[in-house]
UniProtKB/Swiss-Prot annotation:
Alphabetical GO biological process terms: endosperm development; fatty acid homeostasis; negative regulation of endosperm development; negative regulation of seed maturation; positive regulation of DNA-templated transcription; positive regulation of fatty acid biosynthetic process; positive regulation of unsaturated fatty acid biosynthetic process; regulation of embryonic development
Gene assigned in the entry: MYB118
Main location: nucleus
Keywords, sorted A to Z: Activator, DNA-binding, Nucleus, Repeat, Transcription, Transcription regulation
Protein's UniProt name: Transcription factor MYB118
Length: 437
């Protein structure tokens, strides 16, 4: 009811048509009178009705252009006494739409004799309200030619975009497969035969030392890198294949102190020695030293039978040796003392490689005078340890085996900070003093 009252207040003429009640215009507004009407009785047809051609599928119900005196009424109802304006508003040329059968209809404004009047030109609210009562069968909206063309273009563009994406994806996959380097069918990775070496020398004389890929094409199963390395490391005429001299070892040591393990740069300072040769010589010397150490030989015997390069490698790789690093970095740690006295676990102090204090102390205790070693007598040693326990000494044919009481051994080693290597050296000095070596 509120909607009806508001609608009658704002649209009195439409309310008179829709609701068709007997209320007068004065009921809606005092200024309105019944002297004129914009809606005439449709049963009374004029003698000369105006006919307009409008293309449509449905019959258009019309009303007579009413003699409205106010300007807003003519614009509101879409009617006017001006025939030119009325024709411009409601006469539309027939258009042919694609995919739609064109049927022209000549309908007059007075074709329907029903009491209900249709006010041509009104939209939205009125037509939606009347559509529920099925009084008018409104046609479904159809796309115009331009809209249909635009939709088709959008669909075609989407299809083209998807097609281009698929093409790009396939192209990237194909390029990835094409750019992937193809492996040689059968690459020989074994040793070079004398026939291959001879052929390689001939090809290098013919093509030089720059065109290795071209040379590799003439050697079945070989690539350019293999040919280059074989030539520079083995087949080059100026390569030295004899043993290493002391002078070359000194040059190698000096260069290694300056630039480290840069074998290619070191090879420039050693004519006739290739990068591979220098590296192999270094590693072979290092392996020999390690194998001799693992066999149980002490540092004294290693130093007596080693050359300059071995001594340098031992000094460089001292911190890399796990056993020696553990001895050097341990501040206090247990050591199993063998060769002197009983097997006793004692705590030893840190051992410094560059410090020879233990040798000096040992020599002073042994009484080195005028190049002659004076060993303390066994009686004095046993007397010093008689306060606690007794001691004994025994000798064998090949060497001297001494067994001293634990208090004497522990106190002497702790005082001088000896470890297993030190004790072996002291035992060696004792054997020299007794003339056993």
């Amino acid at each position: 009811m509120e909607f009806e009252s508001v609608f009658k207040m704002h649209y009195p003429y439409l309310a008179a048509v829709i609701y068709d009640d007997s209320s007068t215009l004065k009921d809606f507004h005092p200024s309105l009178t019944d002297d004129f009407s914009c809606v005439h009785n449709v049963h009374h047809k004029p003698s000369m009705p105006h006919t307009y051609e409008i293309p449509s599928k449905e019959t258009i119900r019309g009303i007579t252009p009413s003699p409205c005196t106010e300007a807003f009424e003519a614009c509101f109802h879409g009617t006017s006494n001006d025939h030119v304006f009325f024709g411009m508003a409601y006469t539309t040329p027939p258009t042919i739409e694609p995919n739609v059968s064109h049927v022209s209809h000549d309908n007059t404004m007075w074709e329907n004799d029903q009491n209900q009047g249709f006010i041509f030109g009104t939209e939205s609210t009125l037509n939606q309200a009347m559509a529920d009562s099925n009084q008018f069968n409104m046609p479904k909206p159809l796309l115009s030619a331009n809209e249909d063309t635009i939709m088709n273009r959008r669909q075609n563009n989407q299809v083209m975009i998807k097609t281009e994406q698929i093409k790009k994806k396939n192209k990237r996959f194909q390029m990835r497969r094409i750019c992937k380097p193809t492996k040689k069918a059968s690459i020989i990775k074994g040793q070079w035969t004398p026939e291959e070496d001879k052929l390689l020398v001939q090809l290098v004389d013919l093509h030089g030392t720059k065109k290795w890929s071209q040379i590799a094409k003439m050697l079945q199963g070989r690539v350019g890198k293999q040919c280059r390395e074989r030539w520079h490391n083995h087949l080059r005429p100026d390569i030295k294949k004899d043993g290493w001299t002391e002078e070359e070892d000194i040059i190698l040591i000096k260069a290694h102190k300056e630039i480290g393990n840069r074998w290619a740069e070191i090879a420039r300072k050693l004519p006739g020695r290739t990068e591979n040769t220098i590296k192999n010589h270094w590693n072979a010397t290092k392996r020999r030293q390690h194998s001799r150490r693992t066999k149980g030989k002490d540092e004294i015997s290693l130093s007596l039978g080693s050359n300059t390069l071995q001594n340098y490698i031992r000094s460089v790789t001292y911190n890399d040796d796990p056993f020696m690093t553990a001895n050097a970095n341990a501040n206090i740690g247990p050591r199993n003392m063998r060769g002197k006295g009983k097997n006793v676990m004692v705590a030893v102090s840190e051992y410094d490689e560059g410090e020879c204090k233990y040798i000096v102390d040992g020599v002073n205790n042994l009484g080195l005078e005028d190049g002659r070693i004076k060993m303390p007598s066994l009686a004095a040693m046993s007397a010093s340890g008689s306060a606690s326990t007794s001691g004994s000494a025994s000798g064998s044919g090949s060497g001297v085996t001494m067994e001293i009481d634990e208090p004497m051994t522990d106190s002497w080693m702790v005082m001088h900070g000896c470890d297993e290597v030190m004790m072996n050296e002291i035992a060696l000095l004792e054997m020299i003093a007794h003339g056993r070596l």
